[in-house]
Structure formats: structure tokens, C-alpha cells
Amino acid sequence: RRLTGLPWFSAMAVIEGNRLVYESYAADFRADQPHSIMSISKMSANLIIGRLWEEGRIDLGETIGAVLPWIGAGYREATVQDVLNMNVKNGYDEDYSNPDTTAFLHEAASGMRLPTGGEPSNRDFIAAIGLAPGAKDTVNDTGTYLYKSANTDVLAFVAEARGGRALGQWLADLADAAGVEGALHVATDRQGFPLLNGGICLTARDLCRYGAVLGRLGLGVDGRPFGSDPFLRATLAGGISMPPPRGHLRYSNQTNTNGVWLGHGGYGGQYLITNPKTGRTAAFLSVLQDTSGYDPSYYPPIIAMLAEICAGG
């Protein structure tokens, strides 16, 4: 009641299997209204890369440069696995309290923000990311993950290079695998390349259906695999520590996990959790209205609530 009564609240939904357990909406938001899920979009990269890995088309230990010869020094020697785990140190930063953060330049390149000069493509921007100042490599020596939305776009280019088809076709199949009631909307850059780093928009119910694909360990509603069961099991077991206030979680293969559930947050107040053991998935959508649109202390109560609901009982 407290969290769904906040002035920033948009929608919340919970499903168990094919049953809608709970839903709640703000007075100015409808059940059939799509909402940006921001970085919860990144979980789609887990499903796509996991499928390609299981099919033997991607080696998690190979370098990004081996897959994408055009990539710059910021990713050339990083492995696919390190990019999946946000375990790469380079010249890209994502500090929303800094008006000059690289992430805002990335948004301009991908069409999410007006550019101040020319209109570079997302690929050109990603290719130009270099090493961190003074660094000789991309090794992460911080002891915790280094969150970079550019990592997901790198993985998207990897998926397109090794998948043999356009990324949009993967997203069409994802919509079918989730069994969306409405539509899976996704933003693209100026060249039509889908933005897996944060471009997907779904209703609250359909966000739960999307998360349930991971909760079923990669199976679509028709029982056919879209992601990868062994890859998702490895996701639950692996990962890099996250700093406080999420120190009890790990960042693993484009998800957050505590070894029991899989989830992800989104800029502005979104969070999704799916629990493979109980078959429950819960989504919370909101629009946090402060100076930066982000507050790390806002998320822990939401995460705790969704995790407790998805634990069942």
C-alpha cells in the first residue's frame, strides 16, 4: 500500500504461471498503457546471448574484438563474459548526477536525446569508446561491477554479428515467446538498430510476461526455448558483486540476482523480479521526479517487496 501510494507510482502487476495474481494502477495510468521499462530491457540480452551460446555460436571467453573488428580500445580486449557481467573498466561512465556524463552523450547518439552537433550513429559512438584515463587495459580492479549501458549495446552488436539475422527479428520472437497481450515497443537509433540497453516499452502485465520467460529458464509460452536453461542456471550461480545498497546482490549476465531470483532495475523507478522456483514474476513501474531521475535508496524497499511476493507462501 505504501509503495503503490507514492506520487511517482505508475503500475504494479504480479503473475504466477498463467494467472494474474495482483495488479494496481495510478489514477492517471491504465492497464493497457505501455510504460518505458528502461534498463530492464537489458534482460533481453541474457536471453539472446544465452541462446546463441547454447547453439555454439558465441564463446563467452572470446574477446569482443574477435567478434567486432571495428570496436575501439574500450572493448577490444574485453571478453564477452566480462561485458555480460558489467565487469569492464573503460572510458564510459554512467553518473546521472553529472550533466556531462558519457551516458547522456550515448543517449544523443542513439536518438534518445537531442545532439548538440552532428548526429552520430549508435555504432559509431560505441566504436569510439576508449580506455579509462591512464588505464592500460579494461580490467576491472574495483571489486564490484561497473554499470555501463554501452555494454548492452556491444552485446546487441555481437548478437547480430553471430546470430545471422537482424536484431529486430529476435525481438519479434521475444514478443511471441512472452505471449504479450499488447505490443512490445522498442526504440531504435537513427539507423533502426534496437536499443536493448533501455528502449523497450511494455504494459505492467506484459512486463511480467517478459520476465516470466527468464523465470521459465528460457522457455516461451509455447514450450519452445527462446533463451537457454543452462545459461540461466549459470546466471543464478555467477556474477560480480554489486555495491551498497545492493551489496547482497550480484550482477550476472545482464541481470541482478541473489541466487534465488533474477531481476533488473530501470532508470526512473522500475524493477522486475522473477522467481524460477515459485513461478511468480512481479513488476513495479514508476517515474521518480528528482533532479537526476535516480536515487539508489529508492530501490531497496521495492526490491524487497517484489522478492518477498515472488517467494510465495
Regions found by a protein language model. Name each.
Residues 1-29, 272-274, 279-283:
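A short, well-structured edge-of-sheet supersecondary motif
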Residues 18, 35-60, 83, 155-159, ...:
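Active-site SXXK
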Residues 19-22, 65, 99-140, 165-184:
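Short, charged, amphipathic alpha-helices and their helix-cap/turn boundaries
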Residues 54-96, 161-198, 202:
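Active-site helix/loop module of the DD-peptidase/beta-lactamase fold
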Residues 138-147, 195-201, 264, 270:
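Solvent-exposed loop and edge beta-strand segments that line ligand/cofactor-binding
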Residues 150-158, 198-219, 270-287:
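Active-site-proximal alpha-helical segments within enzyme catalytic domains
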Residues 181-185, 232-284, 289:
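Active-site Gly/Thr loop motif
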Residues 294-313:
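Short, gly/Ser/Thr-rich active-site loops of penicillin-recognizing serine hydrolases
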